[in-house]
């Protein structure tokens, strides 16, 4: 098992240097040593970031750095890293998260022992200051259960992905599906017959950034996820042009009031979870029909 090369792919843009250092160090310090760490710099104007990455590369030959000439976004950057990967397996990492020391070792063992093709893991949600918020690890473990739960919500945290390279090659990487490229990938993987699951151990600290909580595109992301499920159920999930047209039509019909109400509900829910305030959490699902539907999908995806 220790001879299998594992490629870990990560994209960086404008994250604080301290976060990036902790992220990189958590990968370089893995108990499993036979890795290549492919880091894409998607901000060619960030000289401090470039200097930092080159220093790491000079000190550890397992690091491979790729520099984009212009900002091309997460999807294309990850595909660029995947195409560069030489490992039998590919793992994901985000530049603001922190992996458990035994993450790669445990995921490789779990994937092999359970005859799976792509897996995720549980996460500990932390604030920007690394204060613990909550643990999320009630994700479907077996492929049969996963195929049912994935139709309600994304049940594999993106930065915890670990899978066979052939999965990424078969799907030709990520597609340009705004706000939901990871959910699109998982649905296509299930549709094509790959076996997905999760190891229900906390193997990553997931940093919940304030900018993501107050994301103005939250409702667009939810509508996109709903359209992806519809495309899966109606057998056109692989037809990208048709899918994107359906998403565009749905989003164009949203009003500013609906988007603002959804955003407010999202903030209330986050405040309720952080402060263990059930009143705020309940209020969040009352003020927006879309957020109410999202919460119901989440509950169905767990139980």
Segments from the language model and where they lie:
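Conserved nucleotide-sugar donor-binding catalytic segment
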Residues: 11, 140-228
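Short loop->beta transition adjacent to catalytic acidic/histidine clusters or analogous donor-positioning motifs
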Residues: 3-7, 28-39, 60-64
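C-terminal subregions of glycosyltransferases and related glycan-biosynthesis enzymes
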Residues: 196, 202, 208-303
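Glycine-rich, basic loop-to-helix element that forms the pyrophosphate-binding segment
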Residues: 23, 68-85, 106
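A conserved acidic beta->alpha catalytic loop
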Residues: 41-51, 70, 94
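Short, well-formed alpha-helical segments that are part of the catalytic scaffolds
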Residues: 15-29
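Conserved donor NDP-sugar-binding/catalytic core segment of glycosyltransferases
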Residues: 102-134
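Short aromatic/hydrophobic "clamp" motif used to bind/position activated sugar donors
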Residues: 90
